[in-house]
């Protein structure tokens, strides 16, 4: 039996599962477009305000700091997952795993100190920071 035929025979279950998932997604999307409401009007394009008349604009400018905090959260959260995976297998990894985890934590702390030093974690405007620095001197 050629190798490609053996590979196909080995993975036929996964192929059927994949086809089933794609078919189910297509079925649900098609059914929702058929059964869903198709009303178009002025009130459909307004933001929902819990039954009250909307006040102001729905478009708000957010500071880039919010996105920075979100990225930092995701980065440090993934790093915490790596440390959790290490803590589960700490007995099997021995001292070499412990030293590797310490190096990993040191790299994390170095990154955090760098972000702190360049001001990525400062929320105060530049003028306020300068005034506070002058007051400390």
UniProtKB/Swiss-Prot annotation:
Enzyme class per UniProt: translocase
Enzyme Commission number(s): 7.1.1.-
InterPro entries the record matches: NAD(P)H_OxRDtase_bac/plastid, NADH_UbQ/plastoQ_OxRdtase_su3, NDAH_ubi_oxred_su3_sf
Listed GO MF terms: NADH dehydrogenase (ubiquinone) activity; NADH:ubiquinone reductase (non-electrogenic) activity; quinone binding
Keyword field: Cell inner membrane, Cell membrane, Membrane, NAD, Quinone, Translocase, Transmembrane, Transmembrane helix, Transport, Ubiquinone
Membrane topology classification: Multi-pass membrane protein
Catalytic activity: a quinone + NADH + 5 H(+)(in) = a quinol + NAD(+) + 4 H(+)(out)
GO cellular component: NADH dehydrogenase complex; plasma membrane
Compartment annotation: Cell inner membrane
Keyword Oxidoreductase applies: no
Domain of life: Bacteria
Function: NDH-1 shuttles electrons from NADH, via FMN and iron-sulfur (Fe-S) centers, to quinones in the respiratory chain. The immediate electron acceptor for the enzyme in this species is believed to be ubiquinone. Couples the redox reaction to proton translocation (for every two electrons transferred, four hydrogen ions are translocated across the cytoplasmic membrane), and thus conserves the redox energy in a proton gradient.
Family named by the database record: Belongs to the complex I subunit 3 family.
Entry protein name: NADH-quinone oxidoreductase subunit A
Organism: Pseudomonas syringae pv. tomato (strain ATCC BAA-871 / DC3000)
């Amino acid at each position: 039996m050629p190798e490609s035929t053996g590979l196909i025979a080995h993975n036929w279950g996964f192929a059927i599962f994949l086809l089933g998932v794609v078919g189910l997604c297509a079925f649900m999307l098609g059914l929702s477009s058929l059964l869903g409401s198709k009303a178009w009007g002025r009130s459909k394009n307004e933001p929902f305000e819990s039954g009250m008349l909307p006040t102001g604009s729905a478009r708000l400018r957010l500071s880039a700091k919010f996105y920075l905090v979100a990225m930092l959260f995701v980065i440090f959260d993934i790093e915490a997952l790596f440390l959790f995976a290490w803590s589960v297998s700490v007995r099997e990894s021995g001292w070499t795993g412990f030293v590797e985890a310490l190096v990993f934590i040191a790299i994390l702390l170095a990154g955090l100190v760098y972000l702190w030093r360049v001001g990525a974690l400062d929320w105060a405007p530049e003028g306020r920071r300068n005034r506070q620095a002058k007051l400390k001197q």
